[in-house]
Amino acid sequence: LDFWTRELGLNISALKRAAADRIAVRPGAEAFLAALADGPKRVIMVTNAHRDALDLKLERTGIDRYFDALVSSHDYGHAKEAQAFWRQLSHSHPFDPARALLVDDSLPVLHSGRLFGLGHLASIRQPDSSLPAREHTDPFPAIDDFLRVLP
């Protein structure tokens, strides 16, 4: 966000707000998050979204109530694709990587999580609801319906 605002001389945050009506929770995702939040495990959102973009998404969806913590890669200065992100996350929010679950729509992020030692990894079959679903997310299983993976 900051980079493109500087590079293009445009208020990218304002442009994102103008398109905010396109922000929505995936079908079944809220029930999935509620079930996780009701369980004994900590639930942490990790995102590459800039804090301004994340705030807008949370304002529109209200899903922040399901998380114990919200971490933007911008907080650490490293994208989730970098091992430095996972090291910083494990220092800020100690967890056992082998027991952690990461659900992400980015295959490079999932590969990075696997390299860090995250034990449970799942992809999103259709990262962009306006585009067709992916045929392959190998080697990661793909979620196409959150209601089918309720804990």
Give the location of each predicted region.
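A metal-dependent, Asp-based hydrolase signature
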Residues: L1-R17
